[in-house]
Structures are given as structure tokens and as C-alpha cells.
Amino acid sequence: MNHKKTSIIILTYNKLEYTQACIESIRKYTPRGTYQLIVVDNLSTDGTRDWLAEQTDILTIFNEENVGFPKGCNQGMELSTGDSILLLNNDVVVTENWLKLMNDCLYSSDEIGAVGPVTNSAYGDQEIAVSYSTLDEMWDFANTYNLTAEPDWERRLKLIGFCMLIKKEAVDQVGLLDEAFTPGMCEDSDYSFRLLKSGFELILCRNVFIHHFGSTSFGEMPEQRQRLWNRNREKFEEKWGFHTSYHAQPREDLVQLMNEQDRYKKMNILDIGCACGATLLNVKYKYPNAELFGIEKNEHAASIAGLIGNVTIGDGETISYEAEAYDYIILGDILQQMKDPWKFLARVKESLKPNGTILASIPNATHYSVIFSLMKSKSLYGKNEMLDHDTLRLFSLSEVQRLFVQSGFDEIGYKMINNEVSTLEQRFIDQLSSLVGSNDNTHLTAVKYLIRATRSKNSYSSLEILLEQINRGIDVNETVLEMTSMLKDGSINSSMIISTVNTLEIDRQLVLNILANQFFIHGLYNDIIPLLNASLEINSKHYDTLYNYASLLHSIGADREALMYLNQIEEKDHESGHLLEKVLNNLI
């Protein structure tokens, strides 16, 4: 039986009716003797102080100024005598078994430092969908939800401060809340990461529900709330080196694309651009036997993710990958940031096991907000939720599908994530659809596409076979004709050819130069230069490549550039000497 005592700390600033409801629910649903109740009042003026002064079971601190949330909590924490400390908003009503269930989780392991419940209203992913519309219905919902026999605990990166239960020994080790975040916001994220860096785990008790009215302090002042959020977010980024929202939010939408039949299978999961590891934690919650791997270029975020799995600091586009190592690879909104997503996907594909799967999220370039911004000559970045400053390229749905086909994936499925639109926005969308003569405008409201693409069971693709044939001199003309046809219909491109050539045990420069010559004959001029550049990366003094480059440049009248390549040929023969003579004559 758990005999631990909890110090419950509540801050108040007006809103007496919420405070009364909160404290009455604590008295009703929490056994006497198991808790200490501390209230810190930040100079309320609505009768709250008078009411608190009348309560005999509450230890109250009456501040003579509004010191804000972090400092007020710290005042209460310094007075606490419990084995654990619970930071609780006054706009909360607690429910049957709430504290017992959270304590059961908190003390189930020495590694756990703090726990929190789910609720109906929270700025983050502790919010769940509820089926009630009145408080009376809420009690019935909570009594059914808070089941003592079914623990459902999920390890998390951060907990929201509306209800956070912390071991006293963790507080002693980590310290108090950072008052730099006064009057409030981001202090709970900061404290969560401090707990993590000190070696403690954070757990979300999914089997505990309490009701949260939500933001009574700032809810009536949305502009002030936004200013505070922006200011404290900047403070958080300056302190930690990453964005609390972007780097700590799990991509549950991508994890949901995994095969539920794999729930207890031993698997290797790689998250490229894993940030602080929130998505990897969500994978572990749903697939407990999964081995977790990540790649993250932000070293500060990677240091957090490294507490969760095997994380490498680096750029996912340039890092090397182990062949056939992973069952799933997660790409959350990173393909649009790649310099060469075709080459990247072709490389990553080789790191998948046969039948391995890519789970990707890609912003939709044809979203109505992007089109509207273009028409209004507004910036596409910043406030626009579609794009950020790291975006290098845009993808429509057809381009997304072609990207995966060209990279050698099959069984490519997609799901649209749509946003709600206003009446005015819908009118704009309808006008766009009418303009292009389309009855289907779903792509205009799709914020992003979720992609599930499986590597072909036959890892030896048709392109690899064609390149092998060219290397061996087998039906070269027919093979090149087939490849030119594939280039023209968009099923392959030069980046895919180069990345595939680099994976094969062939004479790479021979094959690249044969293709360059044949593409010239077939008029595929845009695909020649990338092939010749790729060949020079292998050997910058390669005779055939230098000669073919010079010949191509001479044919389009770029003789000065052609001369540069001819001069790099160390031993000229009759053919290169003749070309040099023609180039020099043109330059006279």
C-alpha cells in the first residue's frame, strides 16, 4: 500500500469560482492524510483571499504582488513537506482515483521523476477527445476512464504544468522552476528537459483523466498570451538550442501508419530528423520491442534524443547508411529540405530491409494558402504554416508520387491531412477549382501528405539491370532506348541514375560516359551534364569524361569552357588533339 504524502501546490489570481471547484474536488476525491494543500495567491481582488483565509486545511501564502507562475510555484515548493510535489492549476477539477493512480506510476520505478494525466483541454498532446458536454456527464466519463486495474503509461519528453506530479528527490536534484520564464509559459517544458538531463524519466498516465477548464489566467487575453509565448519561446531556444514545440512533438500521424500486426515484433526503426526523440518514444509506446535509431543535425536536440535511442548527430542527406538495416524509416517533413531528395531516397531505400517501409510527411505546394500568398505577392514563409525557412523545394501530389516511384518504391499509399477552412476561404477554393475546370478540390485544402511506401521485394530494380547490361555491352542501343523512354515519361531521372550507378560493382565512369554520349544523340541535353559531373567526382582526370565534356561544350559554342576541359587531359591523342585544334581556331 502506498503511504506517500503529496504536497499539492495551487496558484491563484482571481477566478474564485474555479479555485473553489478545484479544492472541493481535491477534498472529495483524495483521501485525508495523503496530501498537504498549499495555495499561493498572487494578489487576487475578487474575494479569493478572504475565502482562502477561512480555510483551515490549506497552507496559504498571500503575496503582496503578482509574482507570476514560476516564482509562485517555487514559494510553495519551498514550504512543501511531502514525498512528492504536485503542481496543479486552479482551473482544474480532479476525479476519482486521480492521485492514487498517478502515485502508482510515479513510484513504480526509481527512474521515474515526474508523471502527468490526460485531460480535455491542454496546449499539447496530453489532450484527448471526450464525449461529455456538461460537468455531470464529465464525472461519469472520468469514473469509467480512471480504471485502477489497467495501467497505461507512456514515456514522454515533456509534461504540461497544469498537473505535474514530481518526486521530492527529483526536485532536490534538479532545483526549482526557472523564474526567467515569469510570468509563465515554457517553464514546464524547461523543467521537463532538466529532469531528463538529470537522468529521470517522464511518464504520461493515460489511465488518469482530470477536467481542465483551460487558461483562465490568459484565456481572456489572447494577444498578451501570444506575446508571452513568443518571448518565452525565444528564451527557451536561447537556453536549450532548439524549439520546444517543433523538436518535442511526436509525429503520431506517421506512427499510426505502421502495421499494427507488428506490435510485438522485434524491429529496427530509424527516424531521420528525429529532433529530441518524441516520435521514437511514441513508437516505443506502441511497439515495445522496437529498437530505436535516430539522426539529428541539431546537436542540442540530439543530446536529448540520445537518452532514448541510438542517435547519430549529422545531416541525413550526407550521412552513410547501413544496408538493409531497418524495418521502418520515418521522414517527418524533411524531404522538402533536401538538396537532392531523389538521390537521398534512393540511398535510404538501400538501408531498408526487403519489404521495409518509408513513412513520410511532405507539405503540399498546392495548398490554397500557398496559391493565395503567391497571388498577393506575400511571403511564402514564416507565419505560413505550410513552409519554413529550411524549405528548398515544393511538391504537388503528382510530384510526391513520382518521387517515390523514381526512387524504386512500390505499394505507395498516401493520406491527406486537411485543415478547416472558413466560408471566405472556401469561396476562394471553389473559384480556383472553377478556373481550372476541376470538381475535385481536396488537394487545395491538404496541408500535407502522409506517405507509406514499401521497398520492392526484388531489391534488384529494372534500372540496375539496364545499367548492368550497358556495363557488359549487352544490347547497348536497345537498353539506352529503354532508358531514354523512362526518362521522358518521368519514371527515372539523372539523379536516380547516378545514385544507382554508385551502388553497383561496375565500371561507373564507362557507363556514365556511354549514357552521356547516347543522351546527346537522343537530345536529352539536360541529363548529360549531371552524368559527366558525377564521373569527374570519381576521377577528375578521366580522359573520356574530359573529352566528352569538351566536345559537348564545343557543340554549343562554349569553346572557352571547352578549352578548360581539354587542357586538363594529360596525354592527348589524335582525337583530342583534333578537337583542340578546332576549339583554338574558333577562339582566334
Predicted regions and their residues:
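A recurrent flexible, glycine/aromatic-enriched loop bordering the glycosyltransferase active site
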Residues: 70, 126, 134-137, 141-169, ...
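Conserved donor NDP-sugar-binding/catalytic core segment of glycosyltransferases
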Residues: 96-131, 364
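Short, acidic, metal-binding catalytic loop of nucleotide-sugar glycosyltransferases
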Residues: 24-34
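A conserved acidic beta->alpha catalytic loop
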Residues: 41-50, 65, 274-277
